[in-house]
């Protein structure tokens, strides 16, 4: 449990670190060490934990860093699919995530973040990053899917070595810069940014909208787009509540031109604690959760994105079941976080 004072300390630590890295010419929008979610084991997360716990966290720190490096080998290449209508010039671009369940039989896509169908937004192009690798047989021409390429072996170690050598050459053997970019989120950001820029160059986009999660691929893509296409207006949508320690949402390079938020308290936290200029924020009602689209949440257990202390959680849950009165509990449906639906660790935890 992190106290209020410690929350502020972490936020201030991250702010100062970002300033320091920018002064030393580190590309903070690309660096995995400058991405500080407290809900996912990134190098930035590990850095904060090491700052809090010191040497006690050293082995876990090293483990997280190595895991993020090795993950590059498991995600060596992403490619685009259904980029077939290059003659049509669109003015709106939506960059979002997709799962198999989001596609309709008519070839359209139902976005779960905006609660919008791809057929209902005029003159729009949709770039979807596939979470589960699904590509429908019937897909409308205004939809492009970015999908991870699969190979015979899960880990492409040759690519990992090649990536490291490329970074050595590109950054002239600067160990400091190499370590900032030699990680999965940095690699993913470069891949997505390259693909998105290539599509933008073939169209006349005036507006780009995306679910904004302050990930390196968000930050780096936005910064690269604004370098080449200053006239494009980029809108981010905060589709979820701010986390308890919102260190990843500090206003910084790569932020969208406008961030749509719901909830006056979130608006205030972004403005007063996370340094977002008020003219960059716009208060709206939620696109994602609407009164008319109520979901039945009864009798369900929702698992988080990252599950820590699995054994402890299972022991506590088992103890809860033992103490419950006979026939007092309904049959419970366990739901894995949607973006972790293919995670073997999460699936195994659910089965336990």
Annotate each language-model stretch with its function.
Residues 1-352:
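Catalytic-core helical/loop segments in enzymes performing group transfer/polymerization on anionic/lipid-linked
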């Amino acid at each position: 449990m992190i106290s209020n004072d410690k929350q502020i300390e972490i936020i201030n630590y991250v702010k100062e670190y970002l300033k320091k890295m920018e002064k030393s010419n580190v590309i903070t929008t690309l660096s995995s060490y400058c991405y500080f979610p407290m809900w996912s084991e990134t190098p930035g997360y590990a850095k904060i934990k090491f700052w809090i716990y010191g040497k006690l966290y050293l082995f876990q720190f090293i483990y997280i860093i190595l895991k993020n490096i090795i993950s590059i080998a498991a995600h060596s290449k992403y490619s685009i699919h259904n980029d077939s209508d290059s003659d049509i010039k669109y003015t709106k671009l939506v960059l979002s995530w997709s799962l198999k369940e989001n596609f309709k039989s008519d070839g359209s896509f139902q976005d779960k973040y905006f609660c919008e169908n791809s057929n209902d937004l005029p003159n729009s192009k949709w770039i979807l990053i596939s979470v589960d690798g699904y590509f429908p047989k019937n897909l409308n021409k205004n939809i492009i899917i970015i999908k991870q390429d699969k190979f015979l072996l899960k880990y492409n170690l040759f690519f990992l070595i090649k990536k490291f050598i490329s970074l050595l050459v590109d950054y002239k053997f600067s160990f400091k810069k190499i370590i900032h970019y030699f990680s999965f989120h940095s690699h993913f950001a470069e891949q997505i940014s390259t693909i998105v820029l290539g599509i933008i160059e073939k169209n006349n986009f005036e507006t780009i909208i995306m679910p904004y999660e302050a990930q390196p691929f968000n930050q780096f893509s936005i910064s690269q787009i604004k370098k080449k296409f200053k006239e494009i207006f980029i809108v981010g949508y905060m589709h979820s509540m701010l986390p308890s320690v919102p260190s990843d949402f500090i206003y910084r390079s790569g932020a969208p031109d406008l961030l749509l938020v719901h909830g006056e308290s979130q608006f205030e936290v972004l403005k007063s604690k996370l340094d977002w200029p008020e003219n960059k924020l716009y208060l709206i009602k939620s696109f994602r959760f609407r009164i008319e689209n109520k979901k039945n949440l009864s009798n369900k257990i929702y698992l988080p994105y990252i599950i820590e202390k699995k054994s402890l959680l299972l022991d506590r849950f088992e103890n809860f079941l033992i103490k419950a009165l006979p026939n007092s509990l309904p049959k419970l449906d366990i739901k894995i976080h949607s973006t972790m639906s293919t995670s073997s660790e999460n699936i195994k935890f659910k089965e336990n």
